[in-house]
From Swiss-Prot:
One cellular component term from this protein's GO annotations in UniProt: cytosol
Record's protein name: Large ribosomal subunit protein eL34A
Quaternary data: Component of the large ribosomal subunit (LSU). Mature yeast ribosomes consist of a small (40S) and a large (60S) subunit. The 40S small subunit contains 1 molecule of ribosomal RNA (18S rRNA) and at least 33 different proteins. The large 60S subunit contains 3 rRNA molecules (25S, 5.8S and 5S rRNA) and at least 46 different proteins.
PANTHER family, A to Z: 60S RIBOSOMAL PROTEIN L34 (PTHR46595)
Broad class of the protein's primary localization: cytoplasm
Keywords, ordered alphabetically: Cytoplasm, Ribonucleoprotein, Ribosomal protein
Role noted for this protein: Component of the ribosome, a large ribonucleoprotein complex responsible for the synthesis of proteins in the cell. The small ribosomal subunit (SSU) binds messenger RNAs (mRNAs) and translates the encoded message by selecting cognate aminoacyl-transfer RNA (tRNA) molecules. The large subunit (LSU) contains the ribosomal catalytic site termed the peptidyl transferase center (PTC), which catalyzes the formation of peptide bonds, thereby polymerizing the amino acids delivered by tRNAs into a polypeptide chain.
Highest taxon of the lineage: Eukaryota
Entry keyword annotation includes Cytoplasm: yes
Gene name per UniProt: rpl3401
Family: Belongs to the eukaryotic ribosomal protein eL34 family.
One example GO MF annotation: structural constituent of ribosome
Pfam families: Ribosomal_L34e (PF01199)
């Protein structure tokens, strides 16, 4: 007859937070091993692509990390992807160029 196993925590329902695996201990007992939930990969705020260089952890574990493991060394590092930052820089540059052109045209029209 198979050995019976019971949950090792108080929660007695088969929920996502109570997932288990059956393992065999060195003492040859069969026991439930509670599995931790997987963390989600941080994503870019603009494009929604997964961020490179930042681990997928649960919120509590992520809060315990040191600062340099939560970010990458770049503007908006840890919030936006590299392509999104590049697009923002190019867009800002083009807008500034457009402002300068508009200003020059205004000066030329006022001189005439």
């Amino acid at each position: 007859m198979a050995q019976r196993v019971t949950y090792r925590r108080r929660l007695a329902y088969n929920t996502r937070s109570n997932r288990t695996r059956i393992i065999k201990t060195p003492g040859n007992n069969i026991r439930y091993l509670h599995i931790k939930k997987l963390g989600t990969i941080p994503r870019c705020g603009d494009t929604g692509v997964p961020l490179q260089g930042i681990p997928a952890l649960r919120p509590r574990e992520f809060a315990r990390l040191s600062h340099n493991k939560k970010t990458v060394q770049r503007a908006y590092g840890g919030c936006l992807s590299a392509n999104a930052v590049k697009d923002r820089i190019v867009r800002a540059f083009l807008i500034e160029e457009q402002k300068i052109v508009k200003q020059k045209l205004k000066q030329l029209s006022s001189q005439k």
